[in-house]
Amino acid sequence: MRPDLERNILLAKSIEKPWRGTYTLVGHTSAVVEAVTTLVDALGDRIISQFGLQCDFVKLRATARLAAYLHDWGKANDHFQMVVRHQSNPLQNPQLIRHEVASLLLGWQYREWLEDCPYSDFLTALAAAGGHHLKLGWNSRKQEPNDELGEIREGSGSDRLYLYMSPKYFEGMIKYGIKALDLPRQLPECVRKPPYCWQVAELKLRRSELLEAFLDWNHDPAFLGVIKALIVAGDAAGSAIPNTDLKIKDWIKKQAGTTLNEVELQQVVDERLAGQPIRPFQVALGNTSTRVSLARAGCGTGKTLGAYNWAKQYALGRKLFFCYPTTGTSTEGFIDYVHDQVDSVLLHSRSAVDLAHLAATGDEDDVETKLESFKAWGAKVSVCTVDTVLGLLQCNRRPMYCFPAIAQSAFVFDEVHCYDDRLFGGLLKFLEVVKAPVLLMSASFLPWQLEAIRKAVGEPVEVIEGAKELEILPRYKFYLSETPNWERVEQELSRTYELPNGDQSCGKVLWVCNQVGTAIAVYKEAKSRGLNALLYHSRYRYQDRVNHHRAVIKAFKKNEPVIAIATQVAEMSLDLSATLLVSQIADPAGLIQRLGRLNRRYIGRSLDAIFYPDPKVGFPYS
């Protein structure tokens, strides 16, 4: 027998004091529809051009609103209602099906009515509503993807799902649909005679019928993806913001309207130039004529500054995402360029540690986590790891929550040469789907990579070469030694260099080892010799690693002799310029990255790189 509900109210969330109308299914649905509508209106036609959609704005708006209306219909069942009323423990007795699956099945059963929603695409709205949570299509028992339309769980303690679709409980939702979405007032039989209960056999049958209907569906994947992302972001806003003193409309309009202007970008460029003239290569980046451009230049040639000059043309009236392959490089890119200069935010899985201002990631329904994710909505510049953006196409949580920012941004992807096959494949898919301004930067692009990029973009791509006069400068002298030469290290730390601009610089040594144990031993030897030594390796706890990372960067910026002993973490995330490199022999790619830290700020002549063998040949990083 179906349990009666107190005051005949369907809940969307568990109740906390003080009472808010958004705890009810009608109230929450109204909040999400309002959030999605405001978001679509704020983004306007740009969302269509950003993703190359074939629909018009009216269809996009109507479909997004219908999906928002449908997204939580499936909460009108006894399993869910008992959970939010704390009368059932989902860990002990999981719900028979996820509420998103129930939303799909109910929406399909009510299709005769819902298909009459003006200007909307019903099937796209239904699919987006059913996929708005990120666990759909996942077998929680086997911890693997589920090809079926959601799993029917074991251990629920029941073989049936009672539904609350009768007027006694669901009339408010029907009336809201008529009022807000202009759905027909004349209700067809499927609405007048709603389902009461689904047993497992009927659930499987209805699921199969829906899957069969979708098999013949000729849909636009980009359109579906955009609607789904809007629902995820709108649901997050509709869940979190009503629990604050903020008004959804006002907040979303303000965040979406915060975009870059030329004065701010010029400020970043001028700050970094520090009175020096801008290089022709950097000027050329600002004058590119294609939507997608490539900057091919080596370390220390000014690619990052050139990228902000590029943004002066392509990110005006937009937001800007600056994407790095690692948390270390994204953190340093944030601190060195835009922190305290432009409304900006650092986004990656460990940015809470880096900035000490983000809450720890919790459950996907945690209000605080969602509110913290919204910082990207209002930031003009987001500096992040590349997965923060590319993960959008895999429906990862953070980029889905950041979608309102991604939907109106220009993008810079740095250090593309460091991407593995998975990341590069994700980049190609992004270039194929997203039609935003994009700048790709790398020390090198292989011919097959250039061909793949051009094919994915499907339109002309301009390649801007770095300053040849800088790249051909003699930066290194190579020496091979059987053992480390401490006398040479001490000699380097006592040196003073005359810089091309007339300034002077003390000697600075970067010593890179292949194993943490070796690095610790070298560090102890350096300290025993009375040297100003710093240790930085990959086995520190992340919070400590961030502190050591910054200590090394800070020490190399001072005009004092210093030696930093590091492991392979130095290969990518250390933006410093050493006057002597000492390194164990490693793989070629690693050695090239290590050399990128030697003479990075050109001293006026070539400097020494000393390599010595690693006794653990074949296991350089173990």
Regions found by a protein language model. Name each.
Residues K319-S330, P500-K527, L534-L535:
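Conserved strand-helix element at the start of the C-terminal RecA-like helicase core
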Residues F445-G502:
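Interdomain hinge/linker at the junction between the two RecA-like core domains of SF2 helicases
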